[in-house]
Amino acid sequence: MFVTIAIPVYNGESYLRDAIQSVVNQTFQDWELYLVNDGSTDGSLAIMQEYALRDIRIKVIDDGQNKGLVTRLNQSIEIAVGKYYARMDADDIMYITRIEEQVKFLESH
């Protein structure tokens, strides 16, 4: 994988599908996505697992505990295999060419 993308999630059920789908729809497709559950108590984990079953590039990290954003980001960095690392929040939507544009910029500098 060229780019590792991480989305830490805490109770993001109402908007998580849009966030994940915005990654899936990227024009740049050589990525892996870590959905890092931070002890969600809503339906977030089920949504994450649903997407992971549909796309082998999507992986769910879940230990059932709430440890906070920084811990979850560090956890995803430790397991990332991509040359580059990107993150976004579970309530965000990634512009369709975001990763493509960022990779082009990074590779040219």
Residue ranges and their predicted role:
Residues 1-109:
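Nucleotide-sugar donor-binding/catalytic module of glycosyltransferases
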